[in-house]
């Protein structure tokens, strides 16, 4: 297949996956946006975590809340647990990589907070440990996942919200995760501040 055809194929696959996700995920994204907005109204914050590209997504989400998304508004409290290399490496060295997010959740998380847990497979041990730690702290969890939801799906409590992308392709899952993050940011802004 020539480069042009490969590029077109990627676009078509992305469009198909987003169309399936639109049908399958609208309600769960709306539920997650409402849950997050309620937490922020109750003076809670949103902690986020993930590995690799999902770490970048966690940081992207936090930056949109802390700064602004598409409207002028005050900053909102959000912390990406993926950014402090001293903390991450000290926890990994002294305990294990499995604990790098969970220890931060236990230190920073309160019952009114939300954990945004991002894993394309649901099999990321350190993200799953963070989900368990969030529950220990009385927090709700919004899980961005894909494939069959993996181990993370089985860890979720009744009040948690899973946004599971209907795909087995990591790149397509990541593309929908970014769109879902933008939808969540918009829903939070609309809920808290009304129309732009």
Curated annotation (Swiss-Prot):
EC number(s) from the headed UniProt entry: 5.3.1.28
A GO BP entry is:
carbohydrate metabolic process
Q: Which residues bind Zn(2+)?
A: 60, 64, 174, 182
Q: GO cellular component annotations, sorted alphabetically?
A: cytoplasm
Q: Does the keyword Cytoplasm apply?
A: yes
Which UniProt keywords are listed?
Carbohydrate metabolism, Cytoplasm, Isomerase, Metal-binding, Zinc
Boundaries of every SIS domain copy: 36-196
Annotated cofactor note: Binds 1 zinc ion per subunit.
As its record notes, the protein acts as a catalyst of: 2 D-sedoheptulose 7-phosphate = D-glycero-alpha-D-manno-heptose 7-phosphate + D-glycero-beta-D-manno-heptose 7-phosphate
Q: Please give the InterPro entries that the UniProt record associates with this protein.
A: GmhA/DiaA, Phosphoheptose_Isoase, SIS_dom, SIS_dom_sf, SIS_GmhA/DiaA_subfam
Cofactor(s) it depends on: Zn(2+)
Chief location: cytoplasm
Q: Which cysteines are joined by disulfide bonds?
A: none
Q: What's a Gene Ontology MF term here?
A: zinc ion binding
List residues binding substrate: 51-53, 64, 93-94, 119-121, 124, 174
Pathway in which the depicted protein is active: Carbohydrate biosynthesis; D-glycero-D-manno-heptose 7-phosphate biosynthesis; D-glycero-alpha-D-manno-heptose 7-phosphate and D-glycero-beta-D-manno-heptose 7-phosphate from sedoheptulose 7-phosphate: step 1/1
Q: Where in the cell is it found?
A: Cytoplasm
Top EC class per UniProt? isomerase
Q: What else is known?
A: The reaction produces a racemic mixture of D-glycero-alpha-D-manno-heptose 7-phosphate and D-glycero-beta-D-manno-heptose 7-phosphate.
Question: Subunit structure, briefly?
Answer: Homotetramer.
What the protein does comes down to: Catalyzes the isomerization of sedoheptulose 7-phosphate in D-glycero-D-manno-heptose 7-phosphate.
The entry sums up its family as follows: Belongs to the SIS family. GmhA subfamily.
* Name this protein carries in UniProt: Phosphoheptose isomerase
Organism expressing this protein natively: Alkalilimnicola ehrlichii (strain ATCC BAA-1101 / DSM 17681 / MLHE-1)
Q: Gene encoding this chain?
A: gmhA
């Amino acid at each position: 297949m020539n480069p042009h055809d490969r590029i077109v194929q990627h676009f078509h696959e992305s469009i198909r996956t987003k169309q399936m996700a639109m049908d399958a995920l609208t309600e769960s994204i709306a539920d997650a946006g409402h849950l997050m907005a309620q937490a922020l109204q109750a003076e809670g914050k949103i902690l986020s975590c993930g590995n690799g590209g999902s770490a970048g997504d966690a940081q992207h989400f936090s930056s949109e809340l802390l700064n602004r998304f598409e409207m002028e508004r005050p900053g909102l409290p959000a912390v990406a647990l993926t950014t402090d290399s001293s903390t991450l490496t000290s926890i990994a060295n002294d305990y294990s990589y499995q604990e790098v997010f969970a220890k931060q959740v236990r230190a920073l998380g309160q019952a009114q907070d939300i954990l945004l847990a991002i894993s394309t497979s649901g099999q990321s041990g350190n993200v799953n440990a963070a989900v368990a730690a969030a529950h220990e702290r009385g927090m709700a969890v919004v899980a961005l996942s894909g494939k069959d939801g993996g181990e993370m799906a089985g860890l979720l409590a009744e009040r948690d919200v899973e946004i599971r992308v209907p795909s087995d392709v990591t790149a397509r899952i990541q593309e929908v995760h970014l769109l879902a993050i933008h939808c969540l940011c918009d829903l939070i802004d609309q809920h808290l501040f009304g129309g732009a």
